[in-house]
UniProtKB/Swiss-Prot annotation:
Gene: infC
Organism lineage: Bacteria, Pseudomonadati, Spirochaetota, Spirochaetia, Leptospirales
Keywords from the named record: Cytoplasm, Initiation factor, Protein biosynthesis
Protein name according to UniProt: Translation initiation factor IF-3
GO molecular function: ribosome binding; translation initiation factor activity
Quaternary assembly: Monomer.
Disulfide-bonded cysteines: none
Coiled-coil regions, chain positions: none
InterPro entries on file: T_IF-3_C_sf, T_IF-3_N_sf, Translation_initiation_fac3_CS, Translation_initiation_fac_3, Translation_initiation_fac_3_C, Translation_initiation_fac_3_N
Location(s) in or outside the cell: Cytoplasm
UniProt function note: IF-3 binds to the 30S ribosomal subunit and shifts the equilibrium between 70S ribosomes and their 50S and 30S subunits in favor of the free subunits, thus enhancing the availability of 30S subunits on which protein synthesis initiation begins.
Species annotation: Leptospira biflexa serovar Patoc (strain Patoc 1 / ATCC 23582 / Paris)
């Protein structure tokens, strides 16, 4: 039974298709050959001959200049090193996400402190925090109470975060987004 081809293609197939090696390098009269001994300008045939003698591959490093730059290296090792570098770069990336903290106008002090502690944890990880205060029913009559709570939240976290803009009263909600300041993400 024959295996169906993956409709998205092989993920590892085309990563190195843009790199020209050995006989794939064409339409070039002379190249700058970089090797362990140094670099010099030689013809393409001479570079291919040297690559065969050294049992290495001729890999085009830069082809966008007047003189193409090629290296004498083992292409398998070169591919491995490139994959290793991309994996390391991917590991070091930190995607900033927006975490939301929902509070109410009649929040108890203990609950307020817990919500604040959660927001602080998110900020220390390098994430943004969106604080949303939602009014229900007649609570809208005393919207200044809600604004005071959100302002207190912002004030308590001012050492760790700065608001993108001042709290916005939008219908039945008050929203403020806070960015972490000065701290590197942990983990």
């Amino acid at each position: 039974m024959q295996k169906r081809p993956n409709p998205r293609g092989n993920p590892n197939q085309d990563k190195f298709a843009h790199i020209r090696i050995n006989e794939q390098i064409t339409n070039v009269a002379s190249i700058r050959l970089v090797s362990d001994e140094g670099s010099d300008i030689v013809t393409l045939d001479e570079a291919l001959r040297r690559a065969k003698e050294a049992n290495l591959d001729l890999v085009e490093v830069s082809g966008d200049q007047d003189v193409h730059v090629c290296k004498l290296i083992d292409f398998g090792k070169y591919k491995f090193e490139l994959l290793k570098k991309t994996k390391e770069a991917k590991k070091k990336q930190h995607v900033v996400t927006v975490k939301e903290i929902k509070i109410r106008p009649r929040i108890d002090n203990h609950d307020f402190e817990i919500k604040k502690r959660h927001a602080l944890e998110f900020l220390q990880k390098g994430d943004k925090v969106k604080v949303t205060l939602r009014f229900r029913g007649r609570e809208m009559v005393h919207s200044e109470i809600g604004m005071n709570i959100v302002n207190r939240f912002v004030e308590d976290l001012k050492e760790h975060a700065s608001p993108e803009k001042m709290p916005v009263h939008d219908g039945k909600t008050i929203v403020v987004v806070m960015n972490p300041i000065g701290e590197k993400p942990k983990g």
